[in-house]
């Protein structure tokens, strides 16, 4: 925990909470009038706190030093569920089935394509940070604690990363790589098979429209009415509207201009 000047406390690590906890409160959620539950990413994240970057402070933003992947946005395997979330007899597929069949609640899954884990500036390289694994647990990519400009275009372990930074020390996934696109899109299809009813897309504006068009086309070829909405943090409605065009994937967006007005 991190303490503020007036005794406030902010937690930057795991505090429990799992599928069973949500399911145990499904009736309460349903009685409040909700029809769906949106979970932050459920993918496997590194277990340790990140030792690099700028140390996180109370009330600070865009700082990752000392933080863990409790939030789920630092995936190192897009097919593997994080061990903190399931329990015996309650996989993600079983969770979505029970939410739907017993409570009439749909499941919205948060997905990421822009980045993986924090990947460089660690004093000593840490397990799972900067790494990406396939469905069988084989290492596909490794940032090797190198700054983006030091990545080697001739090293196959660096193929999945752009050679320039984007957000803090997060690995900047290279959506122009066909193998990476296949890896990501197939992972999204896998989670739909496990019961996801819709996707909330993180940092959608950081990835070119062409990727989202390809992803949308492949998903809707199998699931024509599958709903997706993106987090494009911008207050310009004309900019946000570009995501919704069919040529750009026809993906809905969160209404940040309305949020600003409120």
Mark where each language-model region is:
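N-terminal structural segment of carbohydrate-active enzymes
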Residues: 1-106
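Extracytoplasmic/secreted proteins, especially bacterial periplasmic and envelope-associated proteins
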Residues: 17, 21-24, 91-94, 107, ...
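Extracellular/periplasmic catalytic domains that process cell-envelope and extracellular macromolecules
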Residues: 30-33, 98-102, 106, 122, ...
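Aromatic- and acidic-residue-enriched segments that line the glycan-binding/catalytic groove
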Residues: 45-75, 113-159, 243-253
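Active-site-proximal helices and loops of the catalytic beta/alpha 8
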Residues: 96-104, 186-193, 197-262
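Active-site-adjacent "subsite" loops/lids of carbohydrate-active enzymes
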Residues: 127-140, 144, 148-194, 204
